[in-house]
Amino acid sequence: MAVQKSRKTPSKRGMRRSHNALVKSTLSEDQETGEIHLRHHITTDGFYHGKKIINKVQNIQKINA
């Protein structure tokens, strides 16, 4: 089994952990409906950039058919 030659310094430990920080996800408000959603994602109503992309009623009818 591999064993390190010498102990890692706090500086090296910090540099290794520098990419582990948690970041809050950025939320946006839709222009048409005012619904809150993740950036670059479609809303639950089917809107993206203020335009209707997906019609839920048609999708439900396709699934049930």
Swiss-Prot record:
Keywords of this entry: Ribonucleoprotein, Ribosomal protein
GO CC list: large ribosomal subunit
GO BP term (any one): translation
Region (Disordered): 1-32
Biased composition (Basic residues): 1-19
GO MF annotations, alphabetized: structural constituent of ribosome
Superkingdom, natural source: Bacteria
Disulfide-bond pairs as recorded: none
Family per record: Belongs to the bacterial ribosomal protein bL32 family.
Name the record gives this protein: Large ribosomal subunit protein bL32
Organism: Vesicomyosocius okutanii subsp. Calyptogena okutanii (strain HA)
